[in-house]
Amino acid sequence: MPDIVNRKVEHVEIAAFENVDGLSSSTFLNDVILVHQGFPGISFSEINTKTKFFRKEISVPIMVTGMTGGRNELGRINKIIAEVTEKFGIPMGVGSQRVAIEKAEARESFAIVRKVAPTIPIIANLGMPQLVKGYGLKEFQDAIQMIEADAIAVHLNPAQEVFQPEGEPEYQIYALEKLRDISKELSVPIIVKESGNGISMETAKLLYSYGIKNFDTSGQGGTNWIAIEMIRDIRRGNWKAESAKNFLDWGVPTAASIMEVRYSVPDSFLVGSGGIRSGLDAAKAIALGADIAGMALPVLKSAIEGKESLEQFFRKIIFELKAAMMLTGSKDVNALKKTSIVILGKLKEWAEYRGINLSTYDKVRKRE
């Protein structure tokens, strides 16, 4: 078995220090315009950003999506993120726990999260390919118990696996049958998330038919995992690197993925993530159809700089979110979901080509 511990460290190193953010891709969020209200009818001080994340109340409609864990230095990053998200009342997801299930010495880098963040929602994480490889209820329960998780994310990453030097692109349909059966035995909800290439309406409908109602778009336009694996291929002299260059813009852009999932599965719980880099991006994602926004890479980079840097990052994000809410007259998160928007450019073209009627969608995104 490849050394997945070292692979996790290399992934974080490349993500944090190489140019892989939004490389050759776009979120399409620039095509989402929040309509300015010159007289908002509210005061900044009364804006309420609280919302629900399954059974728990959270302070802002933003979560940290899973990215890291597996070795001591990664555990230190997880500890910083957990301490700060606990302070701000923000849910936190961890990276894939496969490494901790298969290597006991990696468990503490994940377990530390709940030790320093006793109250916020924590989201466990395993990969869909592991279901094909033999994972079942036992491994899911282990991942959940390891961090006393409030939910578990199951990540889809076929594009990353295809170009990864040691990739395992295994996505047979019986993995969904296993996931459906496992979900019936778990005490916490399952969120199916992508890994930088977005969820299409076809995938959302398929997952929904197997009982999945919670999604995380992780759309194109943020951390480019094909680029990360391309860099790893280059370092190893792997011929896959040349092929990976042709796929750097592969995927469903984040804004399009939010629309596709919300339109095809209207009653879903939806995290809009992938290239969310500001509070304004988060506000756009929520107004477009997400329940909350998610981000990973900018959190990772700030955490590497230290706890104070990450705290300042979240203060900035929350201020920008509240500014967008103020300027749209949205006194709370539900109002933000119903605020007036205009969809332009490539996103409008995408929606129309994919059969999404914009007038109908406006009602769907508002949950009317």
From Swiss-Prot:
Keywords, in A-Z order: Cytoplasm, Flavoprotein, FMN, Isomerase, Isoprene biosynthesis, Magnesium, Metal-binding, NADP
Root EC class: isomerase
Co-factor(s): FMN; NADPH; Mg(2+)
Entry's EC annotation: 5.3.3.2
Keyword ATP-binding: no
Gene3D superfamilies: Aldolase class I
Pfam family membership, one: FMN_dh
Biological processes annotated in GO: isoprenoid biosynthetic process
Catalytic activity: isopentenyl diphosphate = dimethylallyl diphosphate
GO molecular function ontology, one term from the record: isopentenyl-diphosphate delta-isomerase activity
One Gene Ontology term, aspect cellular component: cytoplasm
PANTHER family: ISOPENTENYL-DIPHOSPHATE DELTA-ISOMERASE (PTHR43665:SF1)
Subunit and partners: Homooctamer. Dimer of tetramers.
HAMAP family, A to Z: Idi_2
UniProt name for this protein: Isopentenyl-diphosphate delta-isomerase
